[in-house]
Amino acid sequence: MHSAPPLPLISLATTGRLDAPPLAARAALLEAPATPASFAAALGRFRDLFEQVEVAPPPAPRPAPDAPVRIAFWNVERCKHVEASARLLGGLDAAACLLCELDVGMARSGQAHTPRELARRLGAGAAFAVEFLELGLGDAKEREWHAGKVNRAGLHGAAILSPHALDRPAVIRLESGGGWFDGARGERRVGGRIALAATLRIAGIPTTLASVHLESHSDPAGRAAQMRILLGALDAYAPGQPALIGGDFNTCTIDRAWARGTGRRPVLDLERLLDPVPFEPLFEVLSGHGYHWRPCNVPGVPTQRTRPDGTPPPPLGKIDWFFARGLSASAPATVPAVDAGGRAISDHEVLVVTVAPDPAAR
C-alpha cells in the first residue's frame, strides 16, 4: 500500500491542541475498503493531525541547563500506568525525557491524554506528535481486554517532556506507506513511523533531541533505510548542531514481519541479541553520519522487559539505544521499568545518559 500522497518529511507546525477525528469518522474508515485509495483519502482528510506538533510549555520554565545534563529515553508501551510512570521518570532528574508509544484517548490506557498527564505530574512542558490514528482498540489482547469499549480520540505517538523551554519542535515522518492500514499486522491504523525532534540549549549551545520509533514489522535493511531518512532529516532540521537520538530501533537482527507471519521464532544466541551491531546495518549508517553509541549505552544488558502476562518471553534483546553526535556521553544506565511493587509497567526499560557539548567536535 504505497499510493498515498506523501506528507512532508519535516513539519515545524505547532498547535496548542490536536483535534482527533470524531468517532463517526473513525468508524467510517473501518467500514471503507482497506485500499491504497482509502488510506490516501484518510491521510488527506486528517492531514493537520499528522503535520502538527501539540505543544504545552512548562508551567514554570526552568533556566536553560548547564552541562552536563541527564537525558532519558523510554518506550512507555501505551503509557497504561501514568502514576507509576511519572514516579519513575520523576526520580531520574532528567533535563528531558524522550518518549514513544504514548496514547491519547485510548480505552487501553484509560482514555487519558498520557503525555499531558505525565507532564503535569512532572511539572514539565510537553511536545507531542501523532504516529498513528488508531481505528481499533489495539492488539489482540487489548481487543479482548477492552471489548465493547470505544476510543475517545484514538491517537498514539511520541513526546518530549522537559521542565526547560524547548525550541523548534518538529515531527519527522519516516514513512507513510500505509503498512498498518489493512490490518494485516494485527491492528488497523492510519499513519506511519515518526521521529519527534526539538532543540534544547545545553550550556548555551543549541542541541537537537530526537525521540524515535522504527518499524517493528521490518528487517535490518528496512531499519537502515528508515535510519537514513531520519539522519537526513535531522541534518536538514539543524545542520551541524550537536544531537542526541533516543529510540526504540527494534534491532532484533531478524525480519520480524516474517517471524510473526509464520508464527516461528528463530533461535538466536544471547550474544547476538545483546550486541546486534554486526547484524544491523543501521549502525554503519549512523557511524557514517558521525554518531557514536558505545559511551551512551550499557553494554550487554537487554532493554526489553517481560510483562506480567509473560510476554515477551526470554531471551530478551537490546533494541533501545542512544546515539550522539557532537556530544560527550557518560554514565549510561538501564533503569528497570517497574512500579513500587516491582511489577512491570512497560515491556521496555528506561535508558538514561549524561551528555555535554563536546568542544572537540566544534
List where the protein language model places each region.
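Active-site-proximal loop/helix segment associated with metal-binding centers of metalloenzymes
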Residues: 189, 207-216
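Stable alpha-helical elements in mature extracytoplasmic
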Residues: 81, 85, 114, 118, ...
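Active site of divalent-metal-dependent phosphoester/diester hydrolases
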Residues: 3-21, 28-29, 124-162, 252-329, ...
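A short, charged/proline- and glycine-enriched loop
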Residues: 64-69
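Active-site beta-strand/loop signature of hydrolases that rely on acidic residues for catalysis
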Residues: 70-75, 85-111, 127-131, 161, ...
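Structured beta-strand-rich core segments of catalytic domains in phosphoester-bond hydrolases
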Residues: 4-18, 26, 32-59, 103-205
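Acidic-and-aromatic substrate-binding clefts and catalytic sites of carbohydrate-active enzymes
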Residues: 75-83, 104-109, 188, 219-221, ...
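Short helix-loop capping/hinge motifs at secondary-structure junctions, enriched
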Residues: 165-170, 207, 328-331, 360-362
